[in-house]
């Protein structure tokens, strides 16, 4: 089955789109990537999304218009990705997250909430292709975090017979899936995963701040590599209660966003840091937060760490991860084991759509999300009659 996967992550860079050919069933899948592209948002639309994510007051009418605008961009990406290729049978669209709130165990019946714009009904109507969307809602309704949702895809495509592996997504927010060796007894019961905290989001915001928007990220980590990290600041930032919270857990820009960055910059200036050293220290914060999370919550450090997402191209971040993990962990991108690291998240939502529509196969991992049960993920939007 030819499936399209669509997602725009917390970095709000644009829409990652892929066309894949999926065959097989359950966890025994073959997934071939035919094409992957990123379609940047128009700048005005991106700024509207970022403003809404930052909590800027917006009228219901404006949100409705933004929802439609995002759906149109997603539909256009779906149409473009399949040009000159076999037409898609199915679309899996994550949409654009504008708000994510984990469950609050201190309140009675306080489910989490996750809100994505770019409604699937509109995408199905505009493309003429059956679309699955709203993937997080079922897991959240079952008491889960609704995140991370890629872990079952990691199990399916990246687990190994003998190696302890971690798959670390370095998007705006980082998330990890721990994959014990398949040779271990009851290995699937030992899988775990969670959001590790900020990956690119704070560095991206700082780069945009310091360049007045001319640059949106630190390419290859070249800017941060020129500075010196201030470890006492990293020590201070790691006192954030999120990092000590036991998995399952998830987070987003609601915590690690523009306000958090502003507070970090104020504190950095008190310590006499310039812009370069601040970027270096933020990158060190990402590296140390990831490794500290592993040390706290994994049964052991991984034999192999597989990176994906935009941060997988940040050579300085990779260098700092290697330093803190030590030489016993080999770090690679998922490309090195056959899964495109730039479009892994888009591929994941194509697979989740396939499981939902074609097989009625649960897509979540309750050990990872905290849901009370396996769930069918996503709402199915059929092609309108007469299309």
UniProtKB/Swiss-Prot annotation:
Binding locations of ATP: 9-16
CDD domains membership: ASKHA_NBD_ANMK
Please state the pathway this protein functions in, per its UniProt record: Amino-sugar metabolism; 1,6-anhydro-N-acetylmuramate degradation; Cell wall biogenesis; peptidoglycan recycling
The alphabetized UniProt keywords are: ATP-binding, Carbohydrate metabolism, Kinase, Nucleotide-binding, Transferase
**GO BP terms in the entry:** 1,6-anhydro-N-acetyl-beta-muramic acid catabolic process; amino sugar metabolic process; peptidoglycan turnover
Q: Which reaction does it catalyse?
A: 1,6-anhydro-N-acetyl-beta-muramate + ATP + H2O = N-acetyl-D-muramate 6-phosphate + ADP + H(+)
Give EC number(s), comma-separated: 2.7.1.170
Concerning Pfam families, the annotation shows:
AnmK
Q: What class of enzyme is it?
A: transferase
**GO terms assigned for molecular function:** ATP binding; kinase activity; phosphotransferase activity, alcohol group as acceptor
Q: Which NCBIfam families match?
A: PRK09585.2-2, PRK09585.3-2
Q: What is the purpose of this protein?
A: Catalyzes the specific phosphorylation of 1,6-anhydro-N-acetylmuramic acid (anhMurNAc) with the simultaneous cleavage of the 1,6-anhydro ring, generating MurNAc-6-P. Is required for the utilization of anhMurNAc either imported from the medium or derived from its own cell wall murein, and thus plays a role in cell wall recycling.
Record-stated family: Belongs to the anhydro-N-acetylmuramic acid kinase family.
UniProt cross-references to HAMAP family, sorted A to Z: AnhMurNAc_kinase
This protein's name: Anhydro-N-acetylmuramic acid kinase
Organism of provenance: Synechocystis sp. (strain ATCC 27184 / PCC 6803 / Kazusa)
């Amino acid at each position: 089955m030819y499936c399209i996967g669509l997602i725009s992550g917390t970095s709000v860079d644009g829409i990652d789109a892929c066309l894949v050919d999926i065959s097989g069933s359950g966890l025994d899948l073959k997934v071939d990537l035919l094409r992957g592209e990123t379609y940047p948002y128009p700048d005005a639309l991106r700024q509207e999304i970022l403003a809404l994510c930052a909590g800027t007051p917006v009228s219901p009418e404006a949100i409705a218009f933004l929802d439609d605008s995002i759906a149109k961009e997603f539909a256009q990406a779906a149409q473009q990705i399949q040009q000159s290729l076999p037409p898609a049978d199915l679309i899996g669209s994550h949409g654009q997250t504008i708000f994510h709130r984990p469950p609050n165990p201190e309140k009675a019946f306080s489910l989490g909430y996750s809100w994505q714009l770019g409604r699937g009904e509109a995408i199905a109507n505009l493309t003429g292709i059956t679309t699955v969307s709203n993937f997080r809602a079922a897991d959240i309704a079952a008491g889960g975090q609704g995140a991370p949702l890629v872990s079952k895809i990691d199990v399916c495509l990246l687990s190994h017979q003998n190696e302890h592996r971690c798959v670390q997504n370095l998007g705006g927010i980082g998330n990890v899936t721990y994959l014990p060796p398949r040779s271990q007894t009851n290995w699937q019961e030992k899988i775990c995963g969670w959001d590790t905290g900020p990956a690119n989001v704070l560095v991206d915001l700082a780069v945009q701040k310091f360049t007045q928007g001319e640059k949106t990220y630190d390419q290859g980590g070249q800017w941060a590599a020129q500075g010196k990290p201030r470890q006492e600041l990293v020590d201070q930032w790691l006192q954030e209660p999120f990092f000590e919270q036991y998995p399952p857990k998830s987070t987003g820009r609601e915590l690690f966003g523009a306000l958090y960055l502003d507070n970090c910059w104020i504190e950095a200036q008190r310590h006499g840091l310039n812009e370069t050293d601040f970027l270096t220290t933020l990158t060190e914060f990402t590296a140390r937060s990831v490794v500290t999370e592993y040390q706290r919550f994994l049964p052991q450090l991984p034999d192999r760490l597989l990176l994906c997402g935009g941060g997988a191209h940040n050579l300085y971040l990779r260098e700092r991860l290697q330093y803190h993990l030590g030489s016993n962990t080999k770090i690679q991108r998922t490309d090195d084991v056959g899964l495109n690291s730039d479009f892994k998240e888009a591929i994941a939502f194509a697979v989740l759509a396939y499981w939902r529509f074609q097989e009625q196969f649960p897509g979540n991992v309750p050990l990872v999300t905290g849901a009370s049960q396996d769930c069918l993920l996503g709402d199915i939007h059929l092609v309108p009659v007469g299309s």
